[in-house]
Amino acid sequence: MRPSERTANQIRPVTFTRNYTLHAEGSVLVEFGNTKVLCTATVESGVPRFMKGQGKGWINAEYGMLPRATHTRNAREAARGKQGGRTMEIQRLIARALRAAVDLKALGENTITIDCDVIQADGGTRTASISGACVALVDALTHMRAKGMINSNPLKYMIAAISVGIYKGQAISDLEYIEDSAAETDMNVILTETGKIIEIQGTAEGEPFSFDELDELLTLAKHSIREIIDVQKQALA
């Protein structure tokens, strides 16, 4: 039995609240149960130096956690003078995933920066960030079309992400912190709305896992991501 009494394939309640802030071209508060992340999308003309002259756009991402997003206070990384390795890994993951969903040529020489700020953490912050960032990105692209910055929609497909894992010998989806911290296997999966894989991150925290267990985890992820993308589309309708 899971601590939340959810079934193995049952995800937490998921919501996407659009236009959550005033100034950003796209802003979404995404909630996966008690995990809450504010995702904003900022549009700027021009691209990084290494992209200039290619006729393509770029998507960056930054990720951070508020000091009291967790059970105990964590000092702001700015106060420590540098970002941690986990932060850099997650923000690169978010950016990679979003770039895979966009035709960068159709974006023109424009840059979209996605900021994902974790307000409250209860497991799955990176996957919630990716799922929320995709909705914020859609709103930013709509803004760009309305302003005449682009002629067509660069979005190739919606994307979403979910955590899956093996907890007390059982494959489960959408791990809360109490499950994630004790899981024998922890995996993050990012898929397109067509069911294609963008990225899989999986680690055996305790015992190695089998190919059969891997298949079971990926099946759980595919089912869960289909549910999340349905909620994304409802929020955007």
Swiss-Prot record:
GO terms of biological process kind: rRNA catabolic process; rRNA processing; tRNA processing
Record field: catalytic activity? tRNA(n+1) + phosphate = tRNA(n) + a ribonucleoside 5'-diphosphate
EC number assigned by the record: 2.7.7.56
* UniProt xrefs under Gene3D superfamilies: GHMP Kinase, N-terminal domain (3.30.230.70)
Q: Which domain of life is it from?
A: Bacteria
Q: Which UniProt keywords apply?
A: Nucleotidyltransferase, RNA-binding, rRNA processing, Transferase, tRNA processing, tRNA-binding
A single GO molecular function, which one? tRNA nucleotidyltransferase activity
Q: Is rRNA-binding among this UniProt entry's keywords?
A: no
Q: Which residues bind phosphate per the record?
A: 86, 124-126
InterPro entries in the record: ExoRNase_PH_dom1, ExoRNase_PH_dom2, ExoRNase_PH_dom2_sf, PNPase/RNase_PH_dom_sf, Ribosomal_Su5_D2-typ_SF, RNase_PH, RNase_PH_bac-type, RNase_PH_CS
Role of this protein: Phosphorolytic 3'-5' exoribonuclease that plays an important role in tRNA 3'-end maturation. Removes nucleotide residues following the 3'-CCA terminus of tRNAs; can also add nucleotides to the ends of RNA molecules by using nucleoside diphosphates as substrates, but this may not be physiologically important. Probably plays a role in initiation of 16S rRNA degradation (leading to ribosome degradation) during starvation.
Xref: PANTHER family:
EXOSOME COMPLEX COMPONENT, EXOSOME COMPLEX COMPONENT RRP41
Q: What family does this chain come from, according to its entry?
A: Belongs to the RNase PH family.
Assembly, in brief, is: Homohexameric ring arranged as a trimer of dimers.
- Protein name per Swiss-Prot or TrEMBL: Ribonuclease PH
Origin organism of this chain? Pseudoalteromonas translucida (strain TAC 125)
User: Gene of origin?
Assistant: rph
